[in-house]
């Protein structure tokens, strides 16, 4: 497996970043609200051996598949989203915030029986103290499935690629997954998947799948490390009938398994890692925008995605990377 982190010129990078602008991508999957409560710890509670966080700031951001949308928008793309939200305050918040940042929201379907997923993280001194989740994970009705099916059909018109962002909250199920596979094949559209372990038996016939190292290990049945990496890539390709695989490995960078070429390694480009929240969303967004272009290799797409990941993990919270930040990261490393 060769190391490949120098095979992209600045001129080529900037041409790819420019070409991302205006590209249309359909995002299907699980949306949520990422809430952050930030503060400082100055004492331990007298009631229990736990830190007392003095709250200084609160913020809420679109998360999950909605964070994929934020990443696409940050690069000048034109995303549409298809997902379920609850008929609640957080569902309305998601709809409003996505519309305000420029995402088409006609594909957001409201479910009266569902609580919109909310992940709340308490952060002090750049360390996560605790996270608590509020959500409902239930099968949805035939009526809602029909609404989602219609939203997918509308959303596929005129797009350049499709991202399935599966966070295991119930939206990605067999019938809708198969519909997307059938329609993307028929329309010759690029299909990328960010997988979730619980749904591994659903997945098949994907252009690109992007598991992290833990997810890759569960897909292939053995731990993924330097010695087993090559075998893991082959196994995942076979299991999901995927044309290509990119395994994200945190501080160890990425491993790229193209359709018929030698696997490649990319070292991480992060100077410091403050927060990995949403980094996988950044990776699949950039990979889809670039790998779906004519004449672009998976190696080139992965180099750009690796630069973008290096930008976002150096920020706190659910972050995105702009074209200018990716270009600056490249120049800093040159």
What does each model-identified segment do?
Residues 1-42, 330:
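Positively charged, low-complexity intrinsically disordered leader regions
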Residues 243, 269-332:
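Conserved post-catalytic alpha-helical subdomain immediately downstream of the catalytic base
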Residues 108-114, 121-156:
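Conserved phosphate-binding/catalytic loop of the ribokinase/pfkB sugar-kinase fold
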Residues 158-171:
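Short acidic, glycine-rich surface-loop motifs adjacent to enzyme active sites
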Residues 26-28, 131, 160-163, 192, ...:
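Structural motif
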Residues 6-14, 46, 50-116, 329-331:
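Substrate-binding N-lobe of the ribokinase-like
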Residues 31, 167, 282:
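Active-site metal-binding loops of divalent metal-dependent hydrolases
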Residues 169-263:
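Conserved phosphate/ATP/ADP-binding segment of small-molecule kinases
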């Amino acid at each position: 497996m060769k190391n490949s982190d120098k095979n992209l010129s600045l001129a080529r990078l900037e041409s790819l970043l420019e070409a991302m602008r205006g590209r249309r991508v359909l995002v299907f999957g699980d949306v949520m609200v990422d809430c952050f409560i930030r503060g400082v710890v100055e004492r331990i509670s007298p009631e229990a051996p736990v830190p007392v966080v003095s709250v200084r700031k609160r913020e809420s951001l679109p998360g999950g598949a909605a964070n994929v949308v934020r990443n696409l928008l940050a690069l000048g793309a034109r995303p549409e989203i298809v997902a379920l939200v609850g008929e609640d305050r957080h569902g309305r918040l998601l709809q409003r915030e996505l519309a305000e940042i420029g995402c088409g929201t006609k594909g957001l379907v409201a479910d009266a029986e569902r609580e919109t997923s909310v992940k709340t993280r308490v952060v002090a001194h750049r360390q996560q103290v605790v996270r608590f989740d509020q959500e409902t994970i239930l099968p949805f009705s035939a009526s809602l499935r029909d609404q989602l099916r219609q939203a997918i059909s509308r959303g596929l018109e005129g797009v350049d690629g499709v991202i399935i962002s599966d966070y295991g909250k119930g939206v990605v199920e067999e019938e809708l997954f198969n519909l997307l596979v059938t329609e993307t094949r028929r329309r010759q559209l690029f299909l990328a998947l960010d997988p979730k372990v619980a749904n591994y038996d659903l997945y098949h016939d994907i252009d690109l799948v992007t598991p992290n190292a833990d997810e890759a290990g569960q897909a292939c049945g053995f731990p993924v490390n330097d010695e087993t990496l090559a075998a893991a890539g082959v196994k995942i390709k076979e299991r999901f009938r995927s044309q290509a695989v990119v395994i994200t490995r945190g501080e160890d960078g990425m491993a790229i398994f193209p359709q018929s070429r030698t696997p490649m390694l990319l070292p991480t480009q992060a100077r410091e890692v403050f927060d990995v929240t949403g980094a996988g969303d950044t990776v699949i967004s950039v990979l889809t925008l670039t790998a779906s272009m004519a004449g672009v290799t998976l190696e080139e797409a992965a180099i750009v995605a690796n630069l973008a990941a290096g930008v976002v993990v150096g920020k706190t919270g659910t972050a995105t990377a702009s074209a200018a930040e990716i270009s600056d990261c490249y120049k800093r490393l040159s």
